[in-house]
Amino acid sequence: MEVRVIEGEFKGEGVKIGVVVARFNDLLTNELLSGALDCFERHSVEEVDVVKVPGSFEIPLVAKKLAESGKYDAVLALGAVVRGETKHFDLVANEVAKGVAKVSLDSGVPVIFGVITVEDELQGFNRAGVKSNKGFEYAMAALEMANLMKKLREKE
């Protein structure tokens, strides 16, 4: 029996990334974006386009537009949803997650869900801060998936 393992790599050469970032909760989303851009720079990504949207709920529509453009190897969706005293948190978080997954499946382009859902801003800063920046981690996933999809296309 022959077993082949196909994995993506963390190489940025020849990779083009589209980033959709929400402005709402920008103290957190700016940190996520900073972490992602740091990752892309360290891995020599050639082209990154950043598109800002009002809030996390608007991310799926713009992610769809970027994915369908044919210009990007992966799309990274960054946002922050902070729990309040209403059910709005759950509605937004669930719909954004579903929307991002649908865009990825429908377009065939990896769309990475980089929307943090937190109880309060302190928890958000712990996830988007200097000690641990989820933006960097989500960017790594975008790189890995972009390269994996390229490899899978070569196998067809």
From Swiss-Prot:
Q: Name one GO cellular component term.
A: cytoplasm
Q: Does the keyword Coiled coil apply?
A: no
The record's EC number reads: 2.5.1.78
A biological process from GO: riboflavin biosynthetic process
Q: Which residues form the active site?
A: 88
Nucleotide-binding is among the record's keywords: no
Keywords, alphabetical? Riboflavin biosynthesis, Transferase
GO molecular function annotation = 6,7-dimethyl-8-ribityllumazine synthase activity
Residues binding 5-amino-6-(D-ribitylamino)uracil are 24, 56-58, 80-82, 113
Source taxon at top rank: Archaea
Annotated residues that bind (2S)-2-hydroxy-3-oxobutyl phosphate are located at 85-86, 127
Q: In which pathway does it act?
A: Cofactor biosynthesis; riboflavin biosynthesis; riboflavin from 2-hydroxy-3-oxobutyl phosphate and 5-amino-6-(D-ribitylamino)uracil: step 1/2
Instruction: Please write the reaction equations for the catalytic activity of this protein.
Output: (2S)-2-hydroxy-3-oxobutyl phosphate + 5-amino-6-(D-ribitylamino)uracil = 6,7-dimethyl-8-(1-D-ribityl)lumazine + phosphate + 2 H2O + H(+)
One Pfam entry for this protein is DMRL_synthase
Q: What class of enzyme is it?
A: transferase
Q: What does this protein do?
A: Catalyzes the formation of 6,7-dimethyl-8-ribityllumazine by condensation of 5-amino-6-(D-ribitylamino)uracil with 3,4-dihydroxy-2-butanone 4-phosphate. This is the penultimate step in the biosynthesis of riboflavin.
Q: Which NCBIfam families match?
A: lumazine-synth (TIGR00114)
Q: Which family does it belong to?
A: Belongs to the DMRL synthase family.
Q: What is this protein called?
A: 6,7-dimethyl-8-ribityllumazine synthase
- Per the UniProt record, the source organism is Thermococcus kodakarensis (strain ATCC BAA-918 / JCM 12380 / KOD1)
The gene from which this protein is expressed is ribH
